[in-house]
Amino acid sequence: MSKVILTHEVTGLGSAGDVVEVKDGYARNYLVPQGFAISWTRGGKKQVEQIKAARAARELHSMEAAQELKAKLEATRVKLVVKAGREGRLFGSVKTADVAEAVKAAGIGELDKRKIELPNAIKAVGDHEATVRLHEDLSAMITLQVVAAN
C-alpha cells in the first residue's frame, strides 16, 4: 500500500489535500501519472497544509458560485439533439460529455463531465434527469430533453 497526497478531487477517495492509502499499482499507474496525486514524502506535510489553506480560501467563493449555478441548472431544461430511429430509440446513448457540451451550448456554464451522473443509460428520446455534483455538499438535478435530429 502506498500513501499519496491527492492534488485533485477523486471520486471515492477524497478531495485535494487529503492523504490516502491506496494500492501501489493504482498510485503508480493512474493517480500519479494523471496528476491526481503526488507521492507522500517527509515534506508532504507542508504540502498538505498549503493545499488545504488554498482550498479553504477558494471554498467560500466556490460555494457561492456553485449555488448560483445550481439555480440556473435547475431552472433550465437542457436540450440534446441526437440521432434516433423511428421509434425514438437512439443510435448509441447520451454520454456525460454530451450533457456537459449541451449545458455549455445553452449558455448556463461549463461543467466537468466527471461530475455529471446519469442514473441509467439514456437510450431513448424524451425527458430524463441527471445529477451534477457542484461542490462537496451541493448537487443539482438537470432536466434533459432528448430530441431526435431531423
Swiss-Prot record:
- A Pfam cross-reference name: Ribosomal_L9_C
Q: Single Gene Ontology BP term?
A: translation
UniProt xrefs under PROSITE patterns: RIBOSOMAL_L9 (PS00651)
What are this entry's molecular-function GO terms? rRNA binding; structural constituent of ribosome
Q: Which UniProt keywords apply?
A: Ribonucleoprotein, Ribosomal protein, RNA-binding, rRNA-binding
Which superkingdom does the taxonomy of this entry point to? Answer: Bacteria
InterPro entries in the cross-refs? Ribosomal_bL9 (IPR000244), Ribosomal_bL9/RNase_H1_N (IPR009027), Ribosomal_bL9_bac/chp (IPR020594), Ribosomal_bL9_C (IPR020069), Ribosomal_bL9_C_sf (IPR036791), Ribosomal_bL9_N (IPR020070), Ribosomal_bL9_N_sf (IPR036935)
Family membership noted in the UniProt record? Belongs to the bacterial ribosomal protein bL9 family.
- Say what the protein does: Binds to the 23S rRNA.
NCBIfam families referenced in this protein's UniProt entry, alphabetically: L9 (TIGR00158)
Protein name per the record: Large ribosomal subunit protein bL9
